[in-house]
């Protein structure tokens, strides 16, 4: 989580960029409304990343041994127990955990941050910025909290944060490592130094940071970090919270149930210490093993490999989009020193949902549209109506980026070939002849519906 400048082994944004690692679905063929198929260009890594081939291989390898853990005498149970605890150690090593830190497996980042919210001391506020994903905003609203408005520069934002910490005691500062909307990295090390100066701890929402940058709790001094397997090339249902033991040992158990206790009577319970205290029920052993395999694979890459690969693709994408009339790429800060490869843009006079539907239906490109579970940030950017987000990862190649830029340029210059209508808040091709696999069910046109999208019927050609 340290800022650094790439001074060697860089790629030119005009060079052909190949995938850094093998991912499942890299050669997936997607049908087009205009007929035929194209290789799916997955530019939606920030939402959920595909499984690394190495992760899928690991899951297939351990699956025959799957069994209930911790108290089974059978051989498979002993293997599964050893696998779970080895996975715990691997994930801790991935984030540079301190010797006394606890690794708690959860469902995802949202789950992990809600868990921590139930373990906070009651003597101070939680402080966060208005640029956070809802997962790092809503859990803190249940208790004493303060929101600091981010300024137009990181320097001014740090000043505002220090003013808030000086003004009133805070128990925790909750900060994102990298914006899920713009990709801009926040200076975690400096935030930690500020928070500790005023007696507050820091939790880092690393959902976006973990797949793209090295994390080191010892070096940064951050107290807690949370991230998800499904964004870190291990979409098997596991997430994690890693951090200091004392709050987790004293906090309210996240779920009440078997495995989280030392002793139970009909009217009282003695809870176990963390991590068991917060892992009631049968754990997701395969999810933990998958997350550990992803961590091992990413950690084995050369130090700057991720940054070099992403920097070339991001620059290629931003340069291409900003070269199209009527297209604007959005950012929060004027002085962000670095960004992960997440780019949010709008097309003048074209609804973001229509842009995304067009890219999918006519060009086989997957992007995200909407408000990205960050309503306050989209509002401050003037994008309450939504935007389009393109994001890359280890399986992305330069051809994916080039296809997106070409498709957006064609949309601006000539418009879509097909007719589209807004159905229950989502733009969809009308008609939509693309078949779904038989095992997927018949939900064509409704797969993108969301409770936070409320728009009336519209048609566009």
Positions of PLM-derived features:
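Pyridoxal 5′-phosphate
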Residues: 1-461
């Amino acid at each position: 989580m340290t800022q650094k400048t790439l001074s060697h082994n860089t790629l030119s944004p005009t060079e052909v960029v190949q995938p850094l690692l093998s991912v499942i679905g890299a050669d997936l063929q997607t049908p087009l409304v205009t007929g035929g198929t194209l290789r799916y260009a997955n530019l939606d890594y920030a939402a959920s990343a595909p499984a690394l081939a190495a992760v899928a291989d690991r899951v297939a390898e351990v699956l025959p041994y799957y069994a209930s853990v911790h108290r089974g005498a059978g051989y498979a149970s002993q293997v599964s127990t050893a696998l779970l605890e080895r996975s715990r150690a691997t994930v801790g090593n991935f984030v540079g955990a301190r010797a006394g830190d606890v690794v708690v497996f959860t469902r995802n980042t949202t789950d992990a941050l809600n868990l921590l919210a139930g373990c906070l001391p009651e003597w101070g506020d939680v402080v966060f910025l208005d640029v956070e994903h809802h997962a790092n905003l809503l859990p803190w609203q249940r208790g004493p909290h303060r929101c600091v408005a981010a300024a137009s520069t990181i320097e001014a934002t740090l000043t505002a944060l220090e003013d808030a910490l000086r003004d009133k005691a805070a128990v925790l500062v909750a900060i994102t490592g990298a914006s899920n909307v713009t990709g801009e990295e926040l200076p975690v090390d400096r935030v930690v130094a500020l928070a500790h100066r005023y007696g507050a701890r820091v939790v880092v929402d690393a959902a976006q940071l973990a797949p793209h940058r090295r994390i080191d709790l010892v070096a940064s001094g951050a107290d807690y970090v949370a991230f998800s397997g499904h964004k870190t090339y291990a979409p098997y249902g596991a997430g994690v919270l890693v951090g200091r033991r004392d709050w987790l040992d004293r906090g309210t158990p996240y779920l009440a149930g078997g495995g989280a206790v030392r002793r139970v009577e009909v009217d009282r319970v003695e809870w176990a210490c963390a991590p068991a205290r917060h892992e009631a029920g049968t754990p997701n052993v395969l999810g933990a093993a998958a997350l550990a395999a992803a961590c091992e694979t990413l950690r084995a890459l050369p130090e700057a490999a991720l940054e070099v690969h992403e920097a070339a693709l991001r620059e290629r994408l931003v340069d291409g989009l900003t070269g199209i009339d009527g297209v604007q790429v959005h950012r929060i800060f004027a002085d962000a020193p670095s960004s992960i490869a997440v780019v949010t843009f709008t097309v003048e006079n074209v609804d973001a949902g229509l842009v995304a539907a067009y890219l999918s239906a006519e060009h086989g490109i997957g992007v995200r549209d909407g408000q990205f579970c960050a309503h306050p940030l989209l509002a401050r950017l003037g994008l309450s109506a939504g935007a389009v987000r393109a994001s890359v990862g280890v399986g992305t190649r330069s051809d994916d980026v080039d296809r997106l830029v070409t498709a957006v340029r064609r949309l601006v210059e000539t418009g879509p070939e097909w007719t589209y209508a807004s159905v229950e808040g989502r733009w969809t091709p009308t008609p939509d002849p693309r078949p779904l696999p038989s095992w997927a069910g018949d939900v064509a046109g409704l797969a993108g519906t969301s409770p936070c999208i409320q728009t009336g019927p519209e048609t566009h050609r």
